[in-house]
C-alpha cells in the first residue's frame, strides 16, 4: 500500500505507472500463504478526516484520491488476483471517507496507550471490530546496542542513543511507564530489560482483552514485527533478528487455544478460554493465590468446553477475602491445561510490581546438549518473574521471559547453530535483579 501522501493524477502516464506498480506487486506477492488482504494505504483516509495539513486539501485532490484507491488500484489488483479481499485504507469503514475512525465498523488504529500515555488497562475501554494497529516501544537487545555504541554512549539520553530513537519524546515515555509499574532500574542493562518487559505486558493486555471479546472484535495486529536498522522502536524482533520479550509473549497470547484472566474490581478474576481451532476444546483451570515464597494459600479448579472459533467465559472467582490486607504479599496465578496438550499460565499482581514485596530469587539451571539441541532445566527457590535467559550465541528459545512460580523445574530448548562447538555461555536474570534492594533487611 501507499503511505500518508497523495499525488494529483494529472497525466495518463502517472495513472498507468500506478496501475503497473500495483500489478507488479500483486504478481510478486499473491502466492504468499500469509497474505490476508490487500490494503490501499496507511492512514490516509483518517489523516484527511482529522489531521492538520490534510483536511484543507482541495475537492479535486480528494476526487483523485478516490479514483486512485477506490478505482484504479482495486481494478488493477483484481486483474492479477481475483480472490484476495481489497480494503481501501487502514483505518477505514470501507471507503469514501465515511467515518474512517469508527469503533463500530471496519478497522481501527489505537495509540492512547503509548502516545497518549494512558495505562495498559485503557485497552479494556474499547471494543473495536478489528484493531489493526497499536503498539509500544522498547529498546533493542543489549548485544544490538553494543554494535552502534561505545561504553560511554550507553545512556538512553546520550547523543548516540537519541540518534537511534526517532520518536520524539519516546525515551521519556518509556521512563513514564517504568515509573507507573516498576522500581527504577539499577543500571543500563536493567533499563533495557525492563523496557522490553513493559512492551510485552502492554501488547499482551490489548490482545488478550480483544480476544476475550471475539465476535465483537475479530482481530488485533500490533505494530510492529521487525526493524530495518538498529534502533529503539515498536518492533518485537530487533534489526539483527534477536527476539525481544514481546516476541516470546506473542507465542502465548496468539496461541490457537488460550486461557486468560479478566481482572475486575473487588478482586474478581474471571478465566476465559479462547479457541481459534476448528475443533471443540476443553480446559481445566486452577486459580491459585500464592505468597512470595511460593506457598499456596488458596486454590480452586473448574473445567469448561469451548466450541470451534469461539470464546467461553468461566465462573468468576472472588478472591477479595483471601487477598485483602496482604495485597503486597501475594499474587494470583491461573494454570489452564487444554485438551490439545498445551498449557496457558497467567500471573496477576494485586498492585503494581513496584509495590509488591518480591523476594530475591536464586535461579539455577542445568544445561544439556544433544547434537544441536540445547536443553535448560530452570529452578528458582522463590517465585521469579519475567525470567530472561541470554547467551553469548544468538538463540531463539522455546520460551523466555517466563514466570518460575513452582518448585518443579521448567524446561526450555533452543537449536544451536552448526558452527557452535561445546556449551555456550548462558546467564539468567529476573525482575528482582533489575533494581537495587537490600534484601537483608526484608
Q: What do these predicted regions represent?
A:
Residues 288-326, 394-420:
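Intrinsically disordered, low-complexity Pro/Gly/Ser/Thr-rich segments with frequent PxxP/GP/PP motifs
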Residues 270-276, 375-381, 415:
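Short edge beta-strand/loop segments characteristic of extracellular beta-sandwich folds
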Residues 38, 75-78, 87-100, 105, ...:
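Substrate-binding clefts and catalytic carboxylate motifs of secreted carbohydrate-active enzymes
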Residues 1-17, 83, 100-117:
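Aromatic-lined substrate-binding rim segments of carbohydrate-active enzymes
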Residues 239, 252-260, 343-366:
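Long, low-complexity ectodomains and other extracytoplasmic segments of secretory-pathway proteins
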Residues 8-97, 201, 240-241:
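Active-site neighborhood of glycoside hydrolase catalytic domains
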Residues 315-359, 417-442:
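Terminal connector regions
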Residues 277-295, 379-397:
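Short acidic, flexible loop segments centered on an aromatic residue
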